[in-house]
């Protein structure tokens, strides 16, 4: 379980975003731990600068739904996406169909992490999936954060979405093999070794 005391996060305001150095082609990774209006300002600035925004909907609240249509890439876990799909009135017989409805409605990419079942992306250009590593989990806290961090870093290093997702899925899996959030984030060398 993760408990969040807003503290410093709650003091990050939209006007603080103006101080960020964001350039064309950069990747801007955001999550919902700062005020929604601040996340919205960062997504807007990324778009204006020609950067790619990645929104992690965690910790999920319904304010994230409006931002999902603005971010270039949204990452949600199964529960978060299902809640968002209901709020957006996305129709479909299963999650993948609802993900396709999201892309049709927004023109944006949606990635849903599926725990031990890996990850699925639906994009305007096609669908991709990546498997999770077969592990014995110790603690799943931080797996989503690790996934998102590795996804953003891998894309920024020039990997395509499918390869970036595979690396991120492996990293997220490895993060579950140790206790704690930050201490469990694996080194890139360990991720690449596990993928070999």
Where are these regions (language model features)?
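Ribokinase/PfkB-type carbohydrate-kinase core domain
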Residues: 1-128
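Conserved phosphate-binding/catalytic region of the ribokinase-like
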Residues: 62-65, 87, 92-196
């Amino acid at each position: 379980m993760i408990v969040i005391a807003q503290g410093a996060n709650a003091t990050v305001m939209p006007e603080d975003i103006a101080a960020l150095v964001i350039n064309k082609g950069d990747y801007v990774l955001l999550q919902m731990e700062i005020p929604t209006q601040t996340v919205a300002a960062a997504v807007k600035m990324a778009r204006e600068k020609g950067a790619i925004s990645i929104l992690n909907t965690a910790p999920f609240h319904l304010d994230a739904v409006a931002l999902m249509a603005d971010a270039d890439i949204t990452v949600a876990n199964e529960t978060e996406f299902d809640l968002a799909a209901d709020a957006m009135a996305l129709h479909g017989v299963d999650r993948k169909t609802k993900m396709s409805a999201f892309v049709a409605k927004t023109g944006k990419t949606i990635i849903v992490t599926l725990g031990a079942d890996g990850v699925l992306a639906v994009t305007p250009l096609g669908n991709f999936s990546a498997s999770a590593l077969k592990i014995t989990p110790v603690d799943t806290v931080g797996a989503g954060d690790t996934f998102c961090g590795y996804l953003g870093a891998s894309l920024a290093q020039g990997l395509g979405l499918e390869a970036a997702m595979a690396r991120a899925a492996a990293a997220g899996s490895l993060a579950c093999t140790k206790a704690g959030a930050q201490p469990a984030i694996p080194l890139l060398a360990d991720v690449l070794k596990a993928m070999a």
